[in-house]
């Protein structure tokens, strides 16, 4: 459904932390007065705000997206379908949990009712509005704010994940793997079964974690499973973004154009790209980084997914902007 996260940057070392709180339909920013919107044709109406909220919570609990669309109207489709099924399910579950924990209503000066949920009194971005004797969710009123918050939280998360991947590649390079004494970077995320030719491999009890072990464990705890990044050669989304390793760099990169792989081993460096599953829905900016740790970002436009998925080299020219606080990232800054 919808999501928000309470996030912040900690001072000292540039470490990025995310206090993830996935709550469906919850955002702030309702103090402004956007234009008035009409009820959508065919949208369900209710006898009271409580009846409307109860119906939405019941539909979310059953993950009944058709019923949720009937309640929110067709303009709510982008809010319900983010492109990340795991995140959508988690958001539904958290909304239901917070709704049943506590909920109340408060009137606004614009004639709408705001639903607050959970002990934290989170305001739901989509207000309720009265039409005649009936109430309905005024989805268009709060839709843009919901998308802004979803995109913002996803983009902060992708920076953290990129830093973890940089840290993981450095950790991989520092050790030998599969009896090969040559120091090299991993060419893929998930290792071949029984090998350590990727950044993640399964370990037995008591064995050290693989470089991406903690990140994969975090993804698994959120419902993404061990295939959070790639499986069978197919990319999978993680918090609305897809990640891909790049094996060469272009002329705009420091050191000029070159292949990272020499004689089958990636010794010359590494790079990665992270791009949104759905442009202006799960994210806007596309991100790249290499072994130096500096992350760059660029808005590739509506074709971002296609453009980024076809990229084969790291080549941040002057149209790419550095992400503040990620320059010269140290492993200690990321791992803590």
Predicted feature descriptions by range:
Residues 1-16:
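N-terminal secretory signal peptides that target proteins for export/translocation
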Residues 17-32:
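Bacterial N-terminal signal peptides
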Residues 37-58, 142-167, 171:
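Short, low-complexity N-terminal intrinsically disordered segments enriched in polar/charged residues
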Residues 76-124, 232, 236-239, 249-251, ...:
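Surface-exposed, charged secondary-structure patches
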Residues 113-156, 160-163, 294-298:
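Short beta-strand edge/turn micro-motifs at domain boundaries
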Residues 172-283:
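Flexible, glycine-rich surface segments
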Residues 268-322, 335-336:
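C-terminal soluble interaction/assembly domains
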